[in-house]
Amino acid sequence: MWKRMTAKAEGLYIADTKSFVTKQMDKLDFDYGGIPGDLHFGLTKKAGAREPMFSRGTEIFNRRQISIVSIEECNEIALKMGVPRILPEWLGANVAVSGMPDLTSLKEGSRIIFPSGAALLCEGENDPCIQPGEVIQSYYPDQPKLASAFVRHALGIRGIVCIVERPGAVYTGDEIEVHSYQRKVKRKAERV
């Protein structure tokens, strides 16, 4: 069973330098592998700290072609951390949406469809790491220990990672359809 929701693309971003911090764009072209020119582009990637089951450097499938955050969750993280704001680009996001205050809880396998027909497949939560925390710290140098606070406060609200299921152009302001797969849980009968 599928549940349909809507959201709006408030911002589009690309990491086209060696830094994971993204810069704002009006349009992006999604291709198999992600966003051409983006730091995370590719069908495969080298295994790192997030894939401890593989030797570091092993070539594996790239589940993080696109990163999405919600404006509502960014605001919630900022509130928890006691800072005025957290921008999507500080988190390395490629897409910032509004209208989905629970974006991070979107189930794996959910689809995000743009007006052009471009489609993303949700691969799950983007676990918080220290790098965005260090960027946030650089904007608020008078508040100590924000880097580590980010990891703690962003858990469960940091956004999601996706792969491109269907290429296409996306634009700031696009109305997005989200199709979330709602699994029915079957319980085994208890033995008496």
Curated annotation (Swiss-Prot):
Pfam families: MOSC (PF03473). It comes from the Bacteria. GO terms for molecular function: catalytic activity; molybdenum ion binding; pyridoxal phosphate binding. Residues 15-179 form the MOSC domain. InterPro entries: MoCF_Sase_C (IPR005302), MOSC_domain (IPR052716), Pyrv_Knase-like_insert_dom_sf (IPR011037). PANTHER family: METAL-SULFUR CLUSTER BIOSYNTHESIS PROTEINS YUAD-RELATED (PTHR36930), MOSC DOMAIN-CONTAINING PROTEIN (PTHR36930:SF1). This is Putative metal-sulfur cluster biosynthesis proteins YuaD. The lineage of its organism: Bacteria, Bacillati, Bacillota, Bacilli, Bacillales.
